[in-house]
């Protein structure tokens, strides 16, 4: 769930639009900036829609940043692959692997939904910033209004994603308990759940 590009675009757009005067070429530049932002957002939304489709059809990578571990993936039907080769799995192991993938897919889907909502809000924020310029609002007023709107729309979705994490952790533990080959990749713990649940810094 990486929404930092949204923040960059919001900040850049708000500053650029607020810097324009509502007369002459300044207003024209602001309008051009809004059109450019709209095109960029359309492209981002297209990529997110494609990513949503891939959640169902493509393998999930299980490897974290630890380069010492071999490449591991989980197929759509719950098969564990190590370096591209299928790991021997019993019916129980495959069932638990599939249950883990289902939980992962739910979390990833929520993350993509956050990105899609953010793309829409980016356009809304840019349009509001342009209106703010026309209304003579200050830079701070425009920025605060944009940030408040983003928090109002995005925060509930982030909370929904966080609420999924306990089930994901439980599924991870259940599979790791019966699948030794998966254990090195089962790195999520209670602290990850708590960090998400207790996060109060909603600076998008």
Regions of interest found by a model, annotated:
Residues 27-57:
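Post-signal peptide N-terminal segment of mature Sec-exported envelope proteins
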Residues 47-49, 56-79:
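Short acidic, Pro/Gly- and aromatic-enriched capping/linker segments at domain boundaries
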Residues 70-194:
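Mature extracellular/secreted ectodomains of secretory-pathway proteins
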Residues 1-10:
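Bacterial N-terminal signal peptides that target proteins for export
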Residues 191-204:
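Charged, long alpha-helical assembly modules
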Residues 21-24:
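Bacterial signal peptide processing site
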Residues 27, 34, 154, 158, ...:
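Extended alpha-helical interaction scaffolds
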Residues 16-19:
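C-terminal motif of bacterial Sec signal peptides marking the signal peptidase cleavage site
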């Amino acid at each position: 769930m990486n929404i930092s590009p949204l923040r960059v675009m919001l900040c850049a757009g708000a500053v650029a639009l607020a810097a324009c005067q509502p007369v002459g070429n300044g207003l024209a530049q602001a309008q051009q900036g809004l059109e450019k932002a709209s095109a960029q957002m359309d492209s981002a939304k297209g990529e997110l829609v494609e990513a949503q489709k891939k959640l169902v059809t493509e393998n999930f990578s299980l490897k974290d940043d630890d380069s010492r571990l071999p490449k591991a993936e989980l197929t759509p039907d719950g098969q564990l692959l190590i370096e591209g080769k299928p790991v021997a799995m019993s019916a129980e192991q495959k069932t638990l692997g599939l249950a883990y993938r289902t939980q992962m897919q739910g979390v990833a889907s929520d993350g993509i939904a956050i990105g899609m909502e953010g793309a829409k809000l980016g356009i809304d924020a840019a349009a509001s910033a342009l209106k703010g310029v026309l209304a003579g609002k200050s830079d701070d007023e425009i920025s605060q209004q944009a940030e408040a709107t983003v928090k109002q729309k995005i925060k509930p979705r982030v909370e929904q994603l966080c609420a999924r994490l306990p089930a994901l952790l439980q599924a991870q533990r259940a599979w790791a308990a019966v699948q030794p080959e998966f254990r090195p990749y089962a790195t999520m713990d209670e602290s990850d759940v708590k960090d998400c649940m207790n996060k109060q810094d909603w600076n998008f």
